[in-house]
């Protein structure tokens, strides 16, 4: 069982990419070291966390509010739009592009074993942006459950607290995959009612 008090002291990125994903998805499937060589002397960076499960790849970008002091709701909304909806979804799109453009993307899992993560090996890529904001984040931002773009497709947007609850409940990797498939299906069907 994860010690949540200890986990709260960790950075969100470390907590998600190493602790929770290793517990939920097993360390052999988690790739938290995300830099790879694309050409001699050139290094590129994938999203913050990548989880490879058979022919499904989970790609996660994590945004944490560095200044969690009592900012105004307006400042928090600007942070959310700029960092979560803007920068994080762009980083997901960049990762998707790297996965397609490169024939080989060799990364070590948490055990140090090298895997090739190029996109041709996966029938499905599930995309997430996880965020941790201050308490002053407006409800309108919290209601944004996904982002859709021509290049990135459907990208789940979740508060880190929600992700942690899901991770606690869905201990089996296949259950997590099914949950996020269903979440995408339902949010797509109800798009006009969701904060999209």
Question: Residue locations for each model-derived region?
Answer:
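Intrinsically disordered, low-complexity Ser/Thr/Pro/Gly-rich regulatory segments
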Residues: 1-196
């Amino acid at each position: 069982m994860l010690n949540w008090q200890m986990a709260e002291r960790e950075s969100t990125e470390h907590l998600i990419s190493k602790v929770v994903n290793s517990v939920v998805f097993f360390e052999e499937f988690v790739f938290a070291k995300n830099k790879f060589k694309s050409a001699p002397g050139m290094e590129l960076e994938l999203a913050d966390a990548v989880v490879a499960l058979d022919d499904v790849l989970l790609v996660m970008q994590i945004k944490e509010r560095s200044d969690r002091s009592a900012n105004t709701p307006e400042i928090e909304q600007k942070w959310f739009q700029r960092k979560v909806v803007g920068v994080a979804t762009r980083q997901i799109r960049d990762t998707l592009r790297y996965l397609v453009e490169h024939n080989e993307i060799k990364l070590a899992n948490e055990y140090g074993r090298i895997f090739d993560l190029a996109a041709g090996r996966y029938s499905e890529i599930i995309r997430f942006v996880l965020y941790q904001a201050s308490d002053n984040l407006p409800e309108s931002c919290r209601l944004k459950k996904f982002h859709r773009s021509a290049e990135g497709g459907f990208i789940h947007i979740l508060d880190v607290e929600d992700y942690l609850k899901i991770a606690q409940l869905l201990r089996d990797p296949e259950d997590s995959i099914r949950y996020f498939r269903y979440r995408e299906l339902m949010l797509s069907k109800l798009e006009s009612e969701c904060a999209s």
